[in-house]
Amino acid sequence: MLSDIEIAQRAKVWPIAKVAVKLGIKKSQIELYGHYKAKLSFDCIKKLQKKPDGNLILVTAISPTAAGEGKSTTTVGLAQALAKIGKKAIVALREPSLGPCMGIKGGAAGGGYSQVVPMEDINLHFTGDMHAITAANNLLSAIIDNHIHQGNELGIDERRIVWHRVVDINDRALRNIVVALGGKGNGFPREDSFDITVASEVMAILCLSESLADLKKRLSKVIVGYNFADKPVTAGMLKAEGAMAALLKDAIKPNLVQTLENVPAIIHGGPFANIAHGCNSVIATKTALKLADYIVTEAGFGADLGAEKFFNIKCRYAGLTPKVAIIVATVRALKMHGGVSKDKLTHLDKQAVIRGLVNLDKHIENVKKFGVPPVVAINIFSGDSKEEIAAVKAHCKKIGVPVELSDVFAKGGEGGIQLAKKVVDIISKNKSKFRFTYESEDSLEEKTKKIVKNIYGAKDVFFDKKALDSIKKYEAMGFGNIPVCMAKTQYSFSDNPKLYGRPEGFTIEVREARISAGAGFVVMLTGNIMTMPGLPKFPAAEKIDISSEGVIKGLS
């Protein structure tokens, strides 16, 4: 089989204006970025508001392996399958970050015959949104240091600045730095940090904003640090929100591309799900809902992370009601949860698959707790045996959960037709009983406990004194009624990435709490989660190259 990039480069891609016309969008309502990419204009978005909403389908997964279990591939493939059975469908995805593209994954635009294109552009710089977010974030950092250098009228305590610089690359050397060295003319020396761009609050704000006015309002609320009187200092107090919003004036507009089978795709925003809220933008999702009858979107990592935040944060703020949730499961991930070491995941082991089903069971239970009907999609890999696949299907049928095979990687939309039919049938027969894990009125501690106990299955949660002090401060500042955003390993229900399956009797430790006042949530950091990843021993970047003719290879 051809590689992902070879498949993408041989695709018959439509001019993006033709894709727009397919959606009923005039050429004058899109802003072209070459022949195959465009942004949807504010005029386009505004004129869609009176249209009825389509059906929102979420794609999530079991706790993944490091390689991922194919959520993006399944999302794209399902939309293509829906189109094949005559439904008007659209994909709504996050934008890939250069960090994992150059680190572990080598790309994040789907795979095989279920990709979004042009995949090289999407995986690399796309329409420049990531760079605009990086610039807006770092402008605020520059304004903070300049304010201190120019006399510090607001009395910012240099030791209590909480705003970090960002870059969209995995670079562990930047986790802890010292800035303004070299003499008095370079500013006030202090410790600082870099986060990856997709962990920036600016990214979260962009993805939760519904207009330019909303964006600017949220940016003004960003808390950058505290003054010597222990009062918060905001971006608004530094008069930074206008310039930041100006840098984001195009980045806030959703991007329109297409799948390999010319199904429309909106790709916009890209917060990580283990250290941020893990969903594409509200603007993109709401726009997609007006453009098609079936909208297929995804949330990062397993249902304990991305889906939980999709439901409790994004749907809460945006007023969204998902109709069904697809839980992507793979034989290899089930083997991992059944105790098989990473180097033996390709070996036949039906009993390990059966042991690992406890992980799938917990994710199914979690989706049901939100009142959303689940469907299990077994994402097929070439090395999977019939016996292993049959064991998963038999288990799902035994517990009464719909299950279908997904062969969209190898066959495109054709490989997901049965899954598409099942999804349409469930949507037509089920009325949504969507609900949240916690109420806005719950305290920040109570919200965290409800997630930890109900979604992760933990015995209890322990708050370090530092975290507890911060929580009490945030509640005193009036932020007690906003959601919590858990920062946790994606590999386990616990905060220990090596505790696979469905662990029991464990305690989650919240070591730090950080306020994201502009985004509107409090981040609870657990375990050893870092907001700046590092590159692996053999980064994917080593395999990426470009020919003298400008043809890229090595992306996947």
UniProtKB/Swiss-Prot annotation:
GO biological process per UniProt: tetrahydrofolate interconversion
* Alphabetical keyword list: ATP-binding, Ligase, Nucleotide-binding, One-carbon metabolism
GO molecular function terms attached to this record:
ATP binding; formate-tetrahydrofolate ligase activity
What EC numbers are recorded for this enzyme? 6.3.4.3
Q: Which organism is it from?
A: Elusimicrobium minutum (strain Pei191)
Residues bound to ATP are 65-72
Gene name? Answer: fhs
- Catalytic class of the enzyme: ligase
Q: Which InterPro entries match?
A: Formate_THF_ligase, Formate_THF_ligase_CS, P-loop_NTPase
Q: What is this protein called?
A: Formate--tetrahydrofolate ligase
- What family name appears in the similarity comment? Belongs to the formate--tetrahydrofolate ligase family.
Alphabetized Pfam families for the sequence: FTHFS
